[in-house]
Amino acid sequence: MSAHKTKRNVSLVTGGDYHDIDYARHRLLGFLLEHAHLRTRVFHTFDNMDGICASECLVTYTCNVVPDPSQVPKLRSFLENGGRWLALHGTNSWLAQNEQGRWYTPGGHEDYFNLLGSRFAAHPPIQPYRVYVTDTCHPVSRDCRDFMVEGGDELYYMHMLADVRVLMQAKASGAARGFVEREWDAGQSHPVLYEKQVGSGCILYFSLGHRRGHWDMEPLLDYYEREEPGAWELPVFSTLMRRSMTWLQEGVK
């Protein structure tokens, strides 16, 4: 008989713009369902922060979905009291376009990004790039080797806002066309996977995971010509996601 496992409640927040949120939600639920004792509630925004923080674990895949500033203290308290948060891809993104059509991050959500530890700024055109493993002692990155993101993903250029434990990183590969912050130092390292302690709790942020289909650029475009699968179909991505789901439930207070 297998050892009894304590039930853990998970809040999954999946919503936002310019990504195939349905696909990400489906895949994330699949990874969570591999652990029968994880019971998941799905949210599309952070509006019900009390409900979200009633769980022991939080998983987010969002873009342009952030908490109201008045709700951030509840999220911080969730972490300080031992909660774990797996934050994926656009979770650190809040975007708008200026009069020239270039993307930038408006103000107003500094407390949220400071808590998360980073803020997305830009990315170069989607293309393959190498991810470098910088910490082989963490349970998520243990024994991993550097790998290529075949097929490409969004290489996030980010502003780091806190001390974090960087597990994997990538090097800037060129200008971020279409963004206000266009020019970045060639070869500058940007975290791809990091861990941040918050009180008794912890955040694991993973920038990989872009996904876009034909109808995911509305209302800017009625139909987006090409599909962008991102890293989701890479075996190494599935491995890291499964390890992240194990990390999510370990050490929960």
Task: Report each predicted region and the residues it spans.
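Helical hinge/lid and interdomain linker segments adjacent to catalytic or ligand-binding clefts
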Residues: 2, 9-13, 17-97
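Extracellular ligand-binding/catalytic regions of CAZymes and related secreted enzymes
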Residues: 2-8, 34, 182-192, 197-253
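Short, solvent-exposed loop/turn segments at secondary-structure junctions
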Residues: 17-18, 48, 65, 92-94, ...
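Short aromatic-enriched loop/helix-cap "lid" or pocket-rim segments at secondary-structure transitions
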Residues: 23-25, 97-101, 179, 216-219
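Stable alpha-helical elements in mature extracytoplasmic
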Residues: 24, 71, 136, 237-241
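Catalytic beta-strand/loop cores that center a nucleophilic Ser/Cys/Thr
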Residues: 33-37, 41, 53, 118-211
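A glycine-rich, often tryptophan-bearing local segment used as a flexible ligand/cofactor-contacting loop or short
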Residues: 66-143
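A general structural signal marking secondary-structure boundaries and capping sites
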Residues: 82, 144, 248-252
